[in-house]
Each structure stands twice: as C-alpha cells, then as structure tokens.
Amino acid sequence: MRFDNASIVVYYCLIQMNIINLGILAHIDAGKTSVTENLLFASGATEKCGRVDNGDTITDSMDIEKRRGITVRASTTSIIWNGVKCNIIDTPGHMDFIAEVERTFKMLDGAVLILSAKEGIQAQTKLLFNTLQKLQIPTIIFINKIDRDGVNLERLYLDIKTNLSQDVLFMQTVVDGLVYPICSQTYIKEEYKEFVCNHDDNILERYLADSEISPADYWNTIIDLVAKAKVYPVLHGSAMFNIGINELLDAISSFILPPESVSNRLSAYLYKIEHDPKGHKRSFLKIIDGSLRLRDIVRINDSEKFIKIKNLKTIYQGREINVDEVGANDIAIVEDMEDFRIGDYLGTKPCLIQGLSHQHPALKSSVRPDRSEERSKVISALNTLWIEDPSLSFSINSYSDELEISLYGLTQKEIIQTLLEERFSVKVHFDEIKTIYKERPVKKVNKIIQIEVPPNPYWATIGLTLEPLPLGTGLQIESDISYGYLNHSFQNAVFEGIRMSCQSGLHGWEVTDLKVTFTQAEYYSPVSTPADFRQLTPYVFRLALQQSGVDILEPMLYFELQIPQAASSKAITDLQKMMSEIEDISCNNEWCHIKGKVPLNTSKDYASEVSSYTKGLGVFMVKPCGYQITKGDYSDNIRMNEKDKLLFMFQKSMSSK
C-alpha cells in the first residue's frame, strides 16, 4: 500500500470505523463556516481554528470565499470523534448557490442545520429544513451565536416550533452564555419522557404499564427517532467562543448513523469536480457500496466507457492521503479523469435520494469581454466553470452571437465575474439581468411551404401543425409522415429544425408547452438532402407561430409568508401590488400565515423588504412552481437578424395569398 502522511495503523483504523457523511447547512451569515472550523479544531484535525475574518479557513478554500466571507462551492473535509469518521460537507448558504446545496443532499447521512440566535429563521432556513424533512434526512439543529446581545431564546424556540417543526427536542439549557445538558443517557426531565412517549408506541406501552424505563432506554429511543427523522434535537453554542462545540460533536457521533451496506458491488456517485492551480481535474466520489481500488477498471454510467483508476485519495483528519482502496460510505478523490461529469456514477447505478427537484435559474444576462479578442478565452473559462458546476448554463445566441448566462441572482453574477477576472485573468461586462420568460402558441395552426414555389430555395416541402398544450407540458413532436416515404435522416433533420426553432419565439424567448406535428413532406430524390429539410423547417415554424400568435409565460413562485399580525395589512397590500394569487390566510393573536403564488419578476427583493418592515421577525419563503400566462409587463428578447431577407420574402409571399 501507498501512504502520504499516514501510517498503516491509521489506515487500518480508518477502514474499520463507522463512516458518516454530514452536511453543514445554514442561511447566510449564520456562522456555518465558523462552526465547521471549530469542529475541525476541537477534533484535532487542525492545529488552529480558522476564522472567516482572517481568511484562513480550511473549508472556504477559494480566494473569493475567504475575501467575501461566504461559501460558493461545497467543500469536503473530515474529522474523527468517538471512533466515528465524519466527512463534513460545508455547503453554500446563499440562495444563488442553491443548486450546489441540492447536489449534496444526494449523499448525506445526516445534517446540522445552523441558526443564528440573533437573526433567527430566515427564508433559506425554512427552504433547507423543508427539503431535509421531505427527504427524511436526520438533522440536528444548532443555535449559534448565543453570545450576541439582544438574543431572545424563548422567542426563537417558539419560532422554531411555528416555522420548522413541533417535533424538536431541546437538549440543553443556556445560563449566562453557557450550555448545560437537560437530556442525556443518565438523566432526562419528566416532560421529555412524555415527549418520547408521544413519538414511540413501544415506550408509551411500557410507560402506561408502569414498567421500569431507564434514562438509557429513553436515550436509545431518541437516537432511533432522530435516525428516522421523526425528531430533531436542538443544541446551542457560539463558534466565536468555542461554546457547545464538543457537545455538538457528541451529538453528531451519537445521532447520525451510517447506512447499512446492501452489496459488495461497487457503486459510486460523483458529486463534485474542481481544478487545481495547474489545471488538473479532481473528481470527488461518494462510495455508496463496495469499494474502489487503485488500478481498478470500472464502467462510467451504463455506457461503454471504461476508465482505469490510476491514482486514489481519501480525506483523513482534514487532509488528503494516498490509499489503495476506499470503502463503502467514504469519499474518494480521483485526478485527471477527463470523461467524468458531475452526476456520473461508477459500477452499479446507485439508489440516489428520490424526490429532489432541481431548481432551474429564471434569470439571464449577456456577458462580453472588455477586449473582444478574448472572447474565446471567456468561452473556455465558462466551460471550465460549467464542468465544476453544471447549474451554470451558458449558450451562444444563434442570432446575435452573444454569450448568454442563466443566473439564480445578483450574487452569483458577481461571483462569476470575479472568478473570470481573478482565476482566468479576463475582465468581462454583464448586461442588465432579465427575467427568463417563455412563449406558447395561442391557437392551433397549420403552415406549409412547397418545393419549387418561390421564394423557397430548398429542395423540400414541409407542413407543420402547431397547437398549444397545458402549461408545464413542454415540447412534443410527432410525425404523420411514413418512414417508408421519407426516411429517418430526413425526418430527424425536421425534428432538429423544430427544436432549434423553439429556442427563440416571436419575442425571442423559448417556445414551450406545444405539440408540433410534421404533416406534409415532398422531396426530389436526385437532389433533396436532409440539410434542405433542416434549413427550411425554421421558416415554416416561424410563419406558423406568427399566424397563431403567442402567450407570454412568466416564472412563478410558490410563497409562504409568516409575519406578525400587526404587519398583515401591509403584507396583503404588497402581495396585491405584486399581482400574487393568495390561496390561504390563517391568523391568530400574534402571527399571520399567508400562502399563494407570485410572479418572480415582481417579488425579487421582497424577502429583504419583509425582514425590514417586520424587524427581522417575518419570513418570506419561495420556491419555483412553473410558468403561467403573464398578467403584467414583460421584456422582449428579440435577437433575430433583421437582415434575414428570406424570412421577409416568405412573409410577403404568404401575405399576398
């Protein structure tokens, strides 16, 4: 075996340990990275505790992360505590990097959700918790920053029960900024016994039968309830002053359990890619089952591609070590595997967590280099960033030739701009950020362009029928033409032309929620080619779309607004101005809970407005819920070359008939 800074004794200890993969999650500025750094230091993985303010953190390794004090990319490190190896995934806390957060959910055995004792529950907090709850991921809630002035823990406890879950178990009490246990293996309060009985039928039966139940019995039941994501323990601390960190480590090693291995066959999931300063590609994999060995030859996905593992590392106590084998539930690092993409798997297809819906960006902007000769450099850099983060979608507009990037928000745009400048040495300018609208035909229409009928220059006849479909259906393509008459290559060319045409409608936005039927075709055998059909299709499609007209679709958000009762009138007025659809309002003496749908374009900044007018008490949580016909103003995205004389001639020809 080969080792780097690790002995054979350490390695054999490692492969016999229980291994868990833990996500560290939080809203921005809750102290997530600081908590992670304290876990590393307290466990002995680092010799000093990194500080965000000093820019010397282990997990935020990118220069921009250290400078801005936010996490951009999920990073993985490792600690050992109470005989358990814990791979820690420090994830972004900003909504603009939610895609990075979502990817980590696929590999978590448990999570620590960090709240700020001062700021309390934010919109991002509830979004994260709802996902953890939906996927039944065991979760510990850690209330950080209990040292801050003005902290009201009783109000926060009520907020947790109101906005997160009633199934929380407060494990400690806080006195003069210090934490003391009130629930352990040796002691449990009477009210907590009732809590456990209400969540476990076996304990309840023993309790009602006056059978002896020891504190250890209650404790083991709590462990089981947490492992099943039925109960969420709540702990307290201050990363700034290293308060409650050891207790958090104890809770992690007690409550988060490793999964049972179901097979000895290799199954590994690729969740992260990064490039080192020399450009070498580093791929991070979670070994779901079996093991990955040096010099193994393994299949990528279900394809015919095989790769040989020429180098292999894992993470041990905060550092990487070279090994010959990485076992089940551990993290493997493989370098210079060019065929790897995030989301790939090796060996048997893993049973990844189901029910996770990826949020697609609904904003876009054009980007151009300050120096036009550096355009190819920008494209190459964006491609590298896309390999590292597949949610970074960019394309070249087929009409304007502009580079367009889809975005989650302003912060992501600023991060991309800084990365291009500092990492790739190219300065760029972003145009105004736009909402991404879509288009849908209004009515069913049919359009035909005949072969050898001017101004048609192509050796093809094409007839297309367009008809609208229900919102959210997407694009459907059908053909009424027999393959015996027109073979696959010609028909595939038409289908390609349809897909290309749907990229830009009458207002420049993607055309969706429609069925396109290929209804008529004619060709001349000696001269017609698939290219004739491919190139004519967009003109037929465009003319049909003009005849139909289009509805403009705008992205919608499902929202939940939790505010003090005193602010409810203002909130309802605001929601009406934003053209929201209020579906439910429930109020009591203190709080008002409003649910509904609201356009993205009118509600971009409303979360910060809610926080402002409720003095931090209100929560505005949103998630994408598809598109609907817009009720308000919208912007065009027209990029078509106005000098397209052929389209003009087709339009003129059709209008004269």
From Swiss-Prot:
SUPFAM superfamilies named among the record's database cross-references: EF-G C-terminal domain-like (SSF54980), P-loop containing nucleoside triphosphate hydrolases (SSF52540), Ribosomal protein S5 domain 2-like (SSF54211), Translation proteins (SSF50447)
UniProt keyword annotations, A-Z: Antibiotic resistance, GTP-binding, Nucleotide-binding, Protein biosynthesis
Molecular function as annotated in GO: GTP binding; GTPase activity
A biological-process GO annotation: translation
Protein origin, superkingdom: Bacteria
Annotated tr-type G domain residues: 17-260
The keyword Protein biosynthesis appears for this protein: yes
Binding residues annotated for GTP, in chain numbering: 26-33, 90-94, 144-147
Pfam families to which the protein is assigned, alphabetical: EFG_C, EFG_III, EFG_IV, GTP_EFTU
InterPro entries per UniProt: EFG_II, EFG_III/V, EFG_V-like, G_TR_CS, P-loop_NTPase, Ribosomal_Su5_D2-typ_SF, Ribsml_uS5_D2-typ_fold_subgr, Small_GTP-bd
Entry-linked NCBIfam families: small_GTP (TIGR00231), tet_protect (NF012153), tet_protect_Q (NF012154)
Family assignment from sequence similarity: Belongs to the TRAFAC class translation factor GTPase superfamily. Classic translation factor GTPase family. TetM/TetO subfamily.
Task performed by this protein: Abolishes the inhibitory effect of tetracycline on protein synthesis by non-covalently modifying ribosomes. Confers mild resistance to tetracycline when expressed in E.coli.
Protein name: Tetracycline resistance protein TetQ
Organism expressing this protein natively: Bacteroides fragilis
